[in-house]
UniProtKB/Swiss-Prot annotation:
It comes from Pseudomonas putida (strain W619). Keywords: Kinase, Nucleotide-binding, Serine/threonine-protein kinase, Transferase. ADP binds at residues 152-159. GO terms for molecular function: ADP binding; ATP binding; phosphotransferase activity, phosphate group as acceptor; protein serine/threonine kinase activity. Bifunctional serine/threonine kinase and phosphorylase involved in the regulation of the phosphoenolpyruvate synthase (PEPS) by catalyzing its phosphorylation/dephosphorylation. It catalyses: [pyruvate, water dikinase] + ADP = [pyruvate, water dikinase]-phosphate + AMP + H(+); [pyruvate, water dikinase]-phosphate + phosphate + H(+) = [pyruvate, water dikinase] + diphosphate. This is Putative phosphoenolpyruvate synthase regulatory protein.
Amino acid sequence: MKRTAFFISDGTGITAETLGQSLLAQFDSIPFNKFTRPYIDTPDKARTMVQQINAAAERDGMRPIIFDTIVNQDIREILATSNGFMIDIFSTFLSPLEQELTAHSSYSVGKSHSIGGNSNYMERIEAVNFALDNDDGARTHYYDKADLILVGVSRCGKTPTCLYMAMQFGIRAANYPLTEDDMERLQLPAVLKKHHNKLFGLTIDPDRLTAIRHERKPNSRYSSFAQCEFEVREVESLFRRENIPNINSTHFSVEEISAKILVEKGVERRFK
């Protein structure tokens, strides 16, 4: 039986969803129906939310799990009347933090994600634009401005990893797909050689690569197991020969891959 989980916020819901998802991921034997409800910022919206929570409780026969980052005390009290198990993220952590810092919280909605008061905003946008402009080897003449250059076979996870690092940490990451021609030459493309210190390799299990490519080009040579196995074998050999640090992306999330890359390469996050 699935449990229902709500991520409720009077702002975008990013914080409630991120922390809630991380906590629920620790219970991989339990399936969840997950719902994000942003901008619950008036008593009327809160009462409507209570109706949704109670309906889910009646349907499931179990209390929904509620993760909330509601700042307004009145709205929190309305939500607390629901038949749900509430995890109030702000009140759980802010009160002891206020005591430790001997200061009062501003209790501002959406504080961490605001544009005007956040000097990291433009860094984030510039990093995302860099990742998009330098995706899939489309441009190589800006590699001198890159913090990292991810290399690997097509569809091994380079693009989502670059975008995640850009969004979360302001890292300017380019990516370059190693092709069959590169493998036949048994050496790095010239454009990558001069940026060797920025290179990090992604590899992947051949059967997983086959499944991913099959969704894009089914029943093609590109997605065949034999082709995928060949490319992975040759690229891993190239990584060893050129002494390029690398990670197998098969069993890791994009968050884990990104963290491992930054640690391995010693790249500092532009913001945290």
